[in-house]
């Protein structure tokens, strides 16, 4: 991978620094031939009418220019919430919408406020990511509340309000004489510029073949009679595109081509991404169309597997037209996914991703490897001008990179930038998650270079609204289970690893809120302090309100690589293990603000199974992993997860970072390690190395029970093979009881241990151990073991099971474990006998137990008290089956592994009392 010369920093930035920026583009007119023609009347102000400049979302503004050397910070304007949308510009005014649905109009030269309008929905109208769009004299604003508002952009007066009855997360598309709006539920609304409805079209009805309530699990169960699958996936959470009079819509993992025939619509084709690392419908994370009508789809199917494919409409068929070189990713490659639309010019693709060292790349059709233009991680689409590409980073910095080579100019803001910038008349408008819109322009009143952006914002804020305190919870949880004792505060619910609770769960289930996520996740939702926390595999840590999903803060740390690890909430702190090929750190953050308290190094790879974060006893945080050397692809078969091994120099044993589930042995430099740090300072309290017993360490588990620390680790099932390799052959694994304050061993046994892809759990003086591998060579049987926590003595061994994946869930009434592509089993807690089984046949689903129900992928709800009867299923918002839902504080929370989506549901009586914002009418 080639790189451009290093970035030239314009200013120092303690947290944020002074900016200078980019360009802007002209008013656009959609033609029947392509995306748009950029037309400009002599002397008229330039316009940037919609997201990524044109309705194709090509990001290509070739006739615009900026002079980075002359740009300075002229003004900022504060709204009431984080800005997650792109600004638009028309006739000397700039318009932007914040996360809470407030639309502000400002003078384009000064950011002096002109008018503002709050869209309908009240306090629940949050998670607004749909950018506004200019259509003639009107401004179209689509809201998460399900209201679509048409405003007079000169005065802010309401021209029309349309109740679309479900959220909108994609920007309105402005065509020649129409505006198109696609809802989250994949309904398409065609409107006149003034908002007069023209026609509607429904993907769920016409393509999926479902006529019921698409947001109701009971309705899906009644219609299907079984659980929903990837074939029922339907949501449209990303931005659609428009080419001439053909809409190109990402919906349910497919690409829909829909013609506007005037009085109605006509379905042209439904495009499907070819099979690659699976055949299920993938998630679209970004979509763009070039001037020739080629559709660029950035997609993800599973576990970092994705790329940018090109689809082309030929007649009434959508055909694959190639893959953008250098965009392919999977678990055997060092690259991370992209989560944004690409920008395109003359067949050359500009693409961002949240990966340090590869943040912005240029992909030429004749080059196998991309060229790195900026190392800065990003989830925002790039924007092209005549001589530069504008690249917005998760660290709040805007890079203006010369297309012809040479150093970039870097400009700072006060928070992450997650939406594309707008450019007009040589000015650059930057939306920021600190709640401000930044204006950089070649003006004499620009803030002197060297001024920090935080200070500059304070003296240049033209808004009458004070800077918002974004981290404050505005809609706190209420109800009898809102207290901390009902928090699901770590991946397995509590530090005993029980993966179970009883919070009165009962049908019916009802949607409460939905939000978009620019990342992939392998852990369960974690809650505490009224917030829900998410750690993406690419290194973002995100906190949102539990009641509404409103963004509170976002932090990104570089060099995190496929870290499928969970946060843990304890006493106002958040502990997050962040692993990577270059370095791995446990980080402690202030849970209320995201401020870093301390960080401490660890080694090894979490791989598939070690999702758990540290456990905490008193003021001691304890974590376990392995050590050793890693690469994206390992050096021999049993160190890899598919693909051809890559031999290492000097016959070194190198493990894949995401390695095999078949583990006869581990590399000789893998040492099982346990660390303990002071929770308040991060100072190392003690450390243990169990390599005298065996080699391994990454396939392990921890739990705290009755004031003791329990640790279990797998060394591989084949003792003879280990002996031939010169490794300790005496034990296939270890389970130990330790003093959590000192690390001293109280007892240990090598008779019973986790066998990978599983942690251990404890309750009522007993430990429960499972796993995916066989325990020893010569048998294919797997078992669940129950040990006496006092001395490690075996209490019972279950009958043979397919596997016991992730964790043995230990409730007050039920003992449950899941199997990979097999039966989930309910065990008698006194004998280990299988009481009954449920044919879940999921992949690696992380079930949870909220008695008497287990919760699976797509919010599946299975009643263990009724012999595994399926009670509710769907909506199918994810095409993968890796994660289940959790019940915390009287609510259900679900994060999709593959589709970049987070939802909350209510249940029982609350399902009537706490409806989603898009079902509450009227709202004013």
Feature annotation, model-predicted:
Residues 45-55, 80-103, 120-149, 162-189, ...:
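Repeat-blade elements of multi-bladed beta-propeller folds
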Residues 107-111, 152-156, 192-196, 259-263, ...:
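Short loop/turn segments that connect beta-strands within beta-propeller blades
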Residues 44-72, 475-511:
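Blade/loop signatures of beta-propeller domains
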Residues 433, 441-494, 501, 897, ...:
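Extracellular/periplasmic ectodomains of large secreted or surface enzymes and adhesion receptors
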Residues 36-44:
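Bacterial Sec signal peptide processing site at the extreme N-terminus
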Residues 72-77, 112-122, 157-162, 197-201, ...:
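A short beta-strand motif characteristic of beta-propeller blades
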